[in-house]
């Protein structure tokens, strides 16, 4: 039987205890992180109540399985299936979605490397550069970058997109970008998987559009609210709207039936008044008293007013069109005069 080094046993024990001490356990890839950015990330994670521990993949796997057995949570073992590249264990009290967002927000720019895939479009901005004239001008021009020498410096004539998101950096372009000080890459902790409450979350699940989900929740809330009000399902949120709707419906029925209360009397009288005017319009003038005639006249003026405003507006537009046509004719005549002297 092969001898297992004591430091390995101790490492597995410490990792397992770490896993058992936090509700959220993440596997992260640290292989792309240089030493200094990695130390900064460790500090940020500690400041936010978590810990990052980097170890060998085999020891991390053993620690996860050991913790799963001791906690009686066999589903935790599934996390070990996502160990890849240079894995590290990140334990925290943040929920998986907040953790993913936190790690994405704390990614840092990095210099160009040949063969690396850029995460977003790379643009060389217009303007002077710190570069002195030399072979690099020809290299830029050969790659479609509009560069020329102005006042002893290499100047870019216009903003130029040299790479689209997902494209690979060539050695020639890497040299140019590094010379210009443009850092098209990002370094950070890449999430491999996160465990919480028996569920393992992968990056494609965690990478959500927050605003889209907020909009969806708001729409769902409004639909549920409207449904609850329409079926008169009382809750603390809907009871006021349900009572208001019931009151308005009862009032409408009472007005329709002519049932007089202090809430309906004004609407009933108004309805009767409008019915009276409609009836009066059908009668000869000699049968109407002066007060009724005044009311009918006032109603007619109110009805005609919007029509007059519309007609005035139409006349103004027609007048404006005529003036524009006359101006066009004058310009045409002036042009002919200039042409033929």
UniProtKB/Swiss-Prot annotation:
Q: Looking at the record's lineage, which domain of life comes first?
A: Archaea
Q: Does the keyword 4Fe-4S apply?
A: no
Query: Would the keyword Membrane turn up in this protein's UniProt record?
Result: no
State any GO BP term from the record: cytoplasmic translation
Cite a single Pfam family from the UniProt record.
Answer: Ribosomal_L10
- What spans are recorded as compositionally biased (Acidic residues)? 308-332
Q: Where is this region: Disordered?
A: 302-341
Q: Which InterPro entries match?
A: Ribosomal_protein_uL10, Ribosomal_uL10, Ribosomal_uL10-like_insert, Ribosomal_uL10-like_insert_sf, Ribosomal_uL10-like_sf, Ribosomal_uL10_arc
Q: Which GO terms describe its molecular function?
A: large ribosomal subunit rRNA binding; structural constituent of ribosome
Q: Which UniProt keywords apply?
A: Ribonucleoprotein, Ribosomal protein, RNA-binding, rRNA-binding
Q: Which GO terms describe its cellular component?
A: cytosolic large ribosomal subunit
- Entries under Gene3D superfamilies matching the protein: 3.30.70.1730, 3.90.105.20, 6.10.140.760
Subunit field text: Part of the 50S ribosomal subunit. Forms part of the ribosomal stalk which helps the ribosome interact with GTP-bound translation factors. Forms a heptameric L10(L12)2(L12)2(L12)2 complex, where L10 forms an elongated spine to which the L12 dimers bind in a sequential fashion.
Q: What does this protein do?
A: Forms part of the ribosomal stalk, playing a central role in the interaction of the ribosome with GTP-bound translation factors.
Family indicated by similarity:
Belongs to the universal ribosomal protein uL10 family.
Q: Which HAMAP family match?
A: Ribosomal_uL10_arch
Q: What is this protein called?
A: Large ribosomal subunit protein uL10
Species the sequence originates in: Pyrococcus abyssi (strain GE5 / Orsay)
Species lineage: Archaea, Methanobacteriati, Methanobacteriota, Thermococci, Thermococcales
């Amino acid at each position: 039987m092969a001898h297992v080094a004591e430091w390995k046993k101790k490492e597995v024990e410490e990792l397992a205890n770490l896993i058992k001490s936090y509700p959220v356990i993440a596997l992260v890839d640290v292989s792309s992180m240089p030493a200094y950015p990695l130390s900064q990330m460790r500090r940020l994670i500690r400041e936010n109540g978590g810990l990052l521990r980097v170890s060998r993949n085999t020891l991390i796997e053993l620690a996860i399985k050991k913790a799963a057995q001791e906690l009686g949570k066999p589903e935790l073992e599934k996390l070990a299936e996502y160990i890849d590249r240079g894995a590290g264990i990140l334990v925290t009290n943040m929920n998986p979605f907040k953790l993913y967002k936190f790690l994405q927000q704390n990614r840092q720019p990095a210099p160009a490397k040949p063969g690396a895939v850029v995460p977003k479009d790379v643009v060389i901005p217009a303007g002077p550069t710190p570069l002195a004239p030399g072979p690099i001008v020809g290299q830029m021009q050969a790659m479609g970058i509009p560069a020329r020498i102005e006042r002893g410096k290499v100047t870019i004539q216009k903003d130029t997109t040299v790479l689209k998101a997902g494209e690979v950096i060539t050695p020639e372009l890497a040299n140019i970008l590094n010379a210009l000080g443009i850092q098209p890459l990002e370094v950070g902790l890449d999430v491999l998987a996160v465990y919480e409450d028996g569920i393992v979350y992968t990056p494609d699940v965690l990478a959500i559009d927050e605003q889209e989900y907020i909009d969806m929740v708001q729409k769902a809330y409004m639909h549920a609210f409207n449904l609850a009000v329409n079926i008169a399902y009382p809750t603390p949120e809907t009871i006021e709207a349900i009572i208001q709707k019931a009151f308005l419906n009862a009032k409408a029925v009472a007005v329709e039936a002519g049932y007089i209360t202090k809430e309906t009397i004004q609407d009933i009288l108004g309805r009767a008044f409008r019915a009276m005017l409609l009836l009066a319009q059908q009668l000869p003038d000699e049968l109407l008293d002066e007060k009724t005639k005044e009311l009918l006249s006032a109603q007619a003026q109110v009805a005609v007013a919007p029509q007059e405003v519309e007609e005035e507006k139409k006349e103004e537009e027609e007048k404006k069109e005529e003036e524009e046509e006359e101006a066009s004719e004058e310009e045409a005549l002036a042009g002919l005069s200039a042409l033929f002297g």
